[in-house]
């Protein structure tokens, strides 16, 4: 029975992951502003991970800028900035690696203390780079007030969400009219390797 129950729980968690990715994908294709979509994604991540804080930073002129958050600090959106050499967030962007700390995050030598953010005292920290076209364009952080052992599911989810946000940012740079009028077939075929274009059907 314990094994059966464990399998049920794993299946349920997998289904929750799929629903999360589906919700994010649907949000990405709706007619919503980019800030609204990013805010919606942050809310979905909070719901899945049951974290106390989720912050999304995007890269701007060599600095990471806070662009979305589930916690009420509207005055800090667009104003909190980190250099790539600063803090755990900067480390994740610089190293292009997932980072998980289960307790006493504030004692890590890489930690940057802001002084006016509640997250300064949070215990657990999970962070993943936002990747677009194989380049880091941001970082997404999940934090818990209390010590928290991050699961493999949570790490996988945050990594995938980082990739989804990266795809969203690439598409968001295109004007709607340009997207509608684009010759996608020609673009795909012209982007294919020469050998692929030259070979015919088997």
Model-derived features: positions:
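Signal-transducing coupling segments at domain and membrane junctions
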Residues: 74-75, 102-124, 144
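A short, aliphatic-rich beta-strand micro-motif
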Residues: 123-131
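Acidic/proline- and glycine-rich, intrinsically disordered low-complexity segments
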Residues: 75-99
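GAF sensory/regulatory domain recognition
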Residues: 43, 53-80, 84, 105-107
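Signal-transmission linkers at sensory-effector interfaces
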Residues: 1-30, 35, 137, 168-198
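Short beta-strand-to-loop transition segments that serve as allosteric relay/switch motifs
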Residues: 72, 139-148
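Allosteric cytosolic regulatory segments
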Residues: 159-166
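Amphipathic alpha-helical coiled-coil segments that mediate homodimerization
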Residues: 20-28, 33-52, 56, 88, ...
């Amino acid at each position: 029975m314990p094994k059966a129950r464990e399998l049920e729980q794993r299946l349920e968690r997998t289904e929750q992951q799929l629903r999360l990715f589906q919700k994010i994908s649907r949000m990405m294709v709706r007619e919503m502003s980019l800030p609204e979509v990013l805010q919606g994604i942050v809310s979905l991540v909070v719901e899945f991970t049951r974290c106390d804080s989720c912050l999304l930073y995007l890269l701007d002129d060599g600095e990471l800028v806070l662009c979305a958050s589930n916690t009420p600090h509207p005055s800090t959106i667009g104003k909190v900035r980190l250099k790539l050499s600063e803090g755990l967030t900067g480390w994740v962007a610089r190293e292009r690696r997932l980072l998980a700390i289960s307790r006493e995050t504030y004692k890590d030598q890489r930690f940057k203390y802001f002084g006016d953010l509640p997250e300064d005292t949070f215990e657990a920290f999970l962070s993943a780079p936002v990747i677009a076209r194989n380049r880091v364009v941001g970082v997404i952080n999940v934090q818990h007030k209390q010590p928290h052992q991050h699961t493999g599911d949570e790490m996988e989810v945050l990594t995938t969400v980082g990739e989804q946000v990266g795809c969203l940012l690439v598409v968001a740079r295109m004007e709607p009219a340009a997207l509608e009028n684009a010759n996608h077939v020609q673009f795909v075929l012209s982007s294919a390797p020469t050998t692929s274009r030259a070979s015919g059907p088997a």
